[in-house]
A protein has these predicted regions:
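Short beta-strand segments
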Residues: 6-8, 104, 134, 161-166, ...
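Active-site-adjacent elements of ketosynthase-type condensing enzymes
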Residues: 110-116, 162-183, 211-228, 274-282, ...
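Short coil/turn connectors at secondary-structure junctions
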Residues: 1-2, 95-99, 126-129, 155-160, ...
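Conserved beta-ketoacyl condensing-enzyme motif
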Residues: 45-124, 130-135, 261-277
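Condensing-enzyme catalytic core mediating Claisen C-C bond formation in acyl metabolism
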Residues: 1-74, 174-244, 248, 252, ...
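Short, well-ordered amphipathic alpha-helical segments that serve as non-catalytic structural scaffolds
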Residues: 53, 75-91, 147, 192, ...
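Claisen-condensing/thiolase-fold acyl-transfer catalytic domains that form or cleave C-C bonds
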Residues: 81, 106-107, 117-120, 125-127, ...
Length: 372
């Protein structure tokens, strides 16, 4: 089965703290009639630090969509190779062994996709398939994992490289002064990530089942208005309450797989804001500790769009990984309103869960397998 291996993460060197964000909001929007509400909402995000691809002074300027998109392309080409090389190393594989590259980004536009540049410059085969995903927003991390899983099921033994590049700060619009826009200015950060899904072998989450769900008639809740000045992010005030609708989707996929949510060992979910995590705890009846990796990503990086799930998963790896055969779930949420969900078990060097249990039994009994 396909195994999602350890992700590689990178964040730009320019950092802005919550206090700096609050100070900027006070100064820039001194006369805003709802300034106090905006400041309170920014504090409530819990986002302590964010990373930006440009210094804050440059971020706050708007030189035009053309210039910003040139910055996007230049910075992506400068920074993506590092996470790609590290992800390949984590998965103990090489560029020539990759059969599909999935590239996800909603914060800049290139045609051809960056996948073509990656293939041409980093030693990938010309036959490598390309799958750019540009319009699923924050759900794209989960979607990339699921499409990689689907590909490995369709072509057994294949390997997939996922690359996420999100420079959310390049979408800052100084003329957007609605409460939702000002909140977003204090929530989103920049990051890059990459991970390999191996068709055989590897250590990580063995992908066993995936699913997608679109909440009917919510397509205007999270959206872009594409104007001369670029992408204008629109966020409906109803978005924070979407987990009441999406928690049952997670529950149903776990049930369909024959597992039980209370018995799950780890959850890696898109942390678009603190209420998402709080509501998942409530509606799934889970302790906050189950979402600690996603919470840490939100606190230290902000909402980094499609890279959130990879950053949170990397934190699980940094923590020593899950126990052998541990049951887990990954979920991305984004425009649509869309949920992309995967369930699977932790694999030791790609061993199936039953083989891992047999290996543990051998270790515990000095090499003699226990039988029923």
């Amino acid at each position: 089965m396909a195994t999602l291996c350890r992700p590689a993460i990178a964040v730009p060197e320019h950092v802005i703290t919550m206090q700096q964000t609050l100070d900027l909001a006070r100064e820039t929007h001194a006369g805003h009639p709802q300034r106090d509400l905006v400041l309170r909402l920014i504090r409530n995000t819990g986002v302590q630090t964010r990373h930006l691809v440009q210094p804050i002074d440059e971020t706050l300027r708007h030189p035009g969509f053309e210039v910003r998109n040139r910055v996007y392309e230049a910075e992506a080409k400068a920074r993506v190779p590092d996470v790609v090389r590290r992800a390949l190393a984590h998965a103990e594989t090489e560029a020539a062994e990759i059969d599909l590259i999935v590239y996800v980004s909603c914060t800049g536009f290139m045609m051809p996709s960056l996948t073509a540049w990656i293939i041409n410059t980093m030693g990938f085969r010309p036959e490598t398939r390309q799958l750019p995903i540009a319009q699923l927003g924050c759900a794209a991390g989960g979607a990339a994992i699921n499409r990689a899983h689907d590909f490995c099921r369709a072509y057994p033994g294949s390997n997939v490289l996922i690359v996420s590049c999100e420079f959310c700060s390049l979408c800052y619009q100084p003329t957007d002064i609605g409460v939702g826009s000002l909140l977003s200015n204090g929530l989103f950060g920049d990051a890059l990530s990459a991970a390999v899904v191996r068709g055989q072998g590897g250590t990580g989450m063995r992908l066993e089942r995936n699913g997608s769900h679109l909440v009917p008639d919510t397509e205007d809740w999270i959206s872009y208005a594409v104007r001369d000045t670029g992408f204008h992010f629109l966020l409906d005030k109803r978005v924070p309450g979407t987990m009441e609708m999406l928690a049952p989707v997670l529950q149903d996929l776990v049930d369909l797989h024959g597992w039980s949510v209370p018995d799950m060992d780890f959850f890696i979910v898109h942390a678009g804001g603190p209420r998402i995590l709080d509501d998942l705890c409530h509606f799934l009846n889970l302790p906050p500790e189950m979402f600690r990796y996603s919470r840490a990503t939100l606190t230290e990086r902000g909402n980094i769009a499609s890279s959130v799930v990879f950053d949170a998963l990397a934190r699980l790896f940094d923590d020593g990984g899950a126990a052998e055969a541990a049951q887990g779930l990954i979920a991305g949420f984004g425009p649509g309103i869309t949920a992309e969900v995967a369930v699977g078990s932790w694999a030791k060097h790609g061993l199936p869960a039953d083989d891992v249990r047999d290996l543990d039994a051998l270790e515990l009994t000095g090499g003699v397998a226990l039988s029923g």
